[in-house]
Amino acid sequence: VNQCVIKTEKGFDLIGSNIDVADTEINLYSKFSREFILREKLEGIDYDYVVIDSSPNLSMMTINGLMATDLALVPLEPHIFAIKGISALMNTLNLVKRANKGLRHKFFITKFDARINAFKELEAELRESLKDDVLKTKIRIDNAVRTSQNEFKTIFEMKNSKCIEDYENLGEEVKACLKN
């Protein structure tokens, strides 16, 4: 893990994804106890927080991420497909929780546009069905996110981004969850 770490100026380290991740996914299937490999690699690593950004599909890499974490943060876009996919996702989380007893989960709403009434209605529906599992913070839709990705910058390096405050609030809310 230490060989892959990229130091940043902002006081956090990254391990970026690349084309080799596809090979890693394939190679995991032939390994014994493959769902625990990431957890084992992270043991003894001295960080306050480790954030694992997984793909939304249920791959072996995603399972490894869920097995290695204490808190799964699940972004939900306020549209009908998110609502329809929640039961399948909950089934997956419950299966993983059999092996990772300490796993908790929280959802947060992302790509939210308050100008669209359907988004507000779907947000209410998500909050009603998931109750306290949905964090209060919503991440507003912001073109600066796409621009930052294209420029290989963090959102915090983008001027005039309206979602910087959203992400800061989300970070505080997540830290509070981790303390409980």
Model-inferred region functions:
Residues V1-D46, Q149-K153:
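P-loop/Walker-type NTP enzyme "switch/lid" segment
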Residues D113, E123-K153:
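Beta-strand-loop-alpha "switch" segments that mediate conformational coupling across diverse proteins
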Residues T62-H79:
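Inter-motif core of Ras-like GTPase G domains
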Residues F32, M90-H105, K111:
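P-loop/Walker A phosphate-binding loop and immediately adjacent motor/lid segment at beta-alpha junctions
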